[in-house]
A protein has these predicted regions:
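Active-site-adjacent "subsite" loops/lids of carbohydrate-active enzymes
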Residues: 274-280, 284-289, 333, 337, ...
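Active-site beta-loop-alpha junctions enriched in small/polar residues
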Residues: 267-272, 314, 351-355, 418-420, ...
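Carbohydrate-recognition beta-sandwich/jelly-roll modules
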Residues: 3-307, 338, 345, 412
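Hydrophobic faces of well-ordered beta-strands that scaffold small-molecule active sites
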Residues: 263-267, 307-311, 346-350, 413-415, ...
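Glycan-recognition surfaces
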Residues: 356-391, 440-534
Length: 534
């Protein structure tokens, strides 16, 4: 069978039954296996089993539907499948539709155990890849050699852009592959770069896992893989984001009429809480009204004029009920009114997923989410798809934000702890949502409710994905390892990632490295160049 050729602006494809050969500016960067393995998950008496797909063969033929549109089919012991490759001048989109019945498990893009070949994955000519994420582990690297795998994790940018940018020696530009889903179909956490073997040499494939939370009875099109061609790594992220907005996959936040006070500067009380610790009290235990009055008075005495003050962890007791601890905050309304008289807006630290103190019929459980070499699991978790919890949270937000008598009249939220979430096959929500999709459901609920109560309420958070653009006013650069000594560069890159993923978003530069004076002061001096000083 003859191979098909497609030529775009900066790339060309040679499309055959055994490989989709990708050229960038005339240089071959990868041979993608046309097949994708789609596993399933079954449950019996609370025990979950993953099933790998077997029995598929190299496609007998590829059909050219039109100029730039190609179709082929596959059959395995689990699914009938239809593959589609849609090419345009800027890039190409690869999609897989499964037909049959089952719950989708692990998905290995461009990899399969075909019966008629020893090849199990795709060949690569690129030498390294860029990970658009951030972490506090000093061992984390944004640039990895192609010969090493990367298992994605949720820590700071939650979720990150689901894409990788690849560099090939001899090329100035970059080749990118990104995973894109429809609204409501982000039932996954990870997007991983994996290694395999093709005969005696290394190959690669990309993967995600729906962990059995997406049921198919008929047909379902998996999140697609879109290929991009750009000038550099950040350009790939920008193109990934623009693709979502341009195709209607996501709604763009136009960011019109931004209140002046959203632009700061910001004072956050977290590190001051540590400095104010007394015997027998934890850092979180210093989230007290008297401590924050001291902070407010220090601000005044030093002629610092912030537009907002963040009351950090743990002003509330318990986390789930999310009401001011009466011992620590005997009169939060009096405090917020006093701050308003000083021109300062009060932002409350808010623990996402916090189920502490919630009724049993509003929460869910899950497994520990992978984090470095261990896992994090702090159940119970609030279930944002549960109608009882949704109604409960709306009442909580009204009490905290409203200026009505008896309410707290606060001005917004700093959303945190997004990584401590229900995870795994057993993490069953009332609405059947999971992963990034359930995270979006929680953001949607908080954002829409807050704006209804107080239109200029500020939502400060750390998602770095175009799907979350519409529910984030201010992106927080998040934590920094005090063992490092290059905070300006680390935070500067994170700011560029947020700007690439959510154009125009305000940037909260967050805290400095208090373990090293020189690194801290250098970052302080550079904060205005990066975002809003905090």
């Amino acid at each position: 069978m003859e191979n098909y050729i497609y030529k775009g602006d900066r790339y060309s494809l040679e499309i055959g039954t055994s490989a989709i050969r990708v050229y960038q500016d005339g240089v071959r960067v990868t041979d993608l296996m046309p097949a994708t393995s789609v596993g399933t998950v079954t449950e019996l008496d609370g025990e979950f089993t993953e099933h790998e797909e077997h029995g598929e063969r190299t496609p007998a033929a590829i059909e050219k539907i039109s100029d730039g549109e190609f179709l082929w089919k596959g059959t395995s012991d689990l699914w009938n499948k239809e593959y589609r490759l849609s090419c345009d001048r800027e890039g190409f989109t690869y999609s897989v539709t499964v037909k049959g019945k089952g719950r989708v498990g692990k998905v290995d893009y461009f990899s399969a155990h075909l019966e008629d070949t020893d090849y199990t994955c795709s060949d690569y000519n690129f030498c390294e890849y860029f990970i658009p994420c951030g972490g506090t582990d000093p061992a984390f690297r944004n640039i990895m050699p192609a010969a090493l795998p990367y298992r994605s994790f949720f820590e700071l940018l939650i979720p990150p852009p689901y894409c990788f940018s690849f560099r090939t020696e001899g090329l100035d530009g970059r080749f990118g592959l990104g995973m894109c889903a429809k609204d409501g179909e982000y039932n996954f956490f990870h997007f991983d770069y994996n290694l395999g073997f093709n005969t005696r040499r290394r190959g690669f494939y990309l993967s995600t896992a729906l962990d059995g939370h997406t049921a198919v009875d008929g047909e379902f099109t998996l999140p697609v893989i879109r290929a991009f061609f750009g000038d550099d790594d950040l350009d790939i992220v920008r193109k990934y984001s623009a693709y979502h907005f341009d195709t209607g996959l996501c709604r763009k936040n136009e960011r019109k009429d931004i209140p002046r006070w959203w632009r700061g500067p910001i004072v956050c009380g977290w590190n001051e809480q540590e400095m104010l610790i007394t015997d027998g009290c934890s850092q979180a235990g210093m989230a007290r009204q008297d401590a924050y009055m001291k902070i407010a008075d220090m601000i005044k005495d030093h002629n610092i004029r912030p537009t907002m003050l963040i009351i950090d962890d743990k002003w509330q007791n318990p986390y789930g009920a999310c009401l001011p601890d009466p011992e620590r905050w005997p009169d939060m309304r009096a405090f917020t009114d006093e701050m308003h008289s000083r021109g300062i807006h009060t932002i409350l630290w808010f623990r996402l997923w916090g189920g502490e103190g919630l009724p049993e019929d509003e929460v869910m459980t899950g497994e520990g989410i992978p984090y470095r070499s261990f896992s994090l699991n702090y159940p119970p978790y609030a279930d944002p798809t549960n109608e009882k919890y949704r109604a409960h949270l709306k009442k909580i937000l009204h009490y905290l934000l409203s200026d009505e008598e008896g309410c707290m009249n606060c001005d917004g939220f700093k959303l945190d702890y997004s990584l401590i979430m229900p995870y795994g096959k057993s993490a069953k929500s009332a609405g059947g949502k999971y992963g990034a999709q359930m995270t979006k459901e929680l953001y949607n609920l908080i954002y829409s409710t807050a704006k209804e109560i107080k239109p200029d309420a500020l939502i400060n958070a750390s998602p770095c994905h175009p799907y979350f653009d519409e529910v984030c006013d201010q992106a927080r650069l998040h934590d920094y390892s005090w063992d490092l000594r290059n905070e300006t560069e680390t935070m500067g890159l994170r700011a560029k990632l947020f700007e690439a993923a959510m154009p125009g978003v305000l940037i909260d530069t967050d805290s400095v490295n208090f373990a090293n004076h020189d690194d801290a002061m250098r970052f302080y001096r550079n904060m205005p160049k990066i975002g809003i000083p905090d």
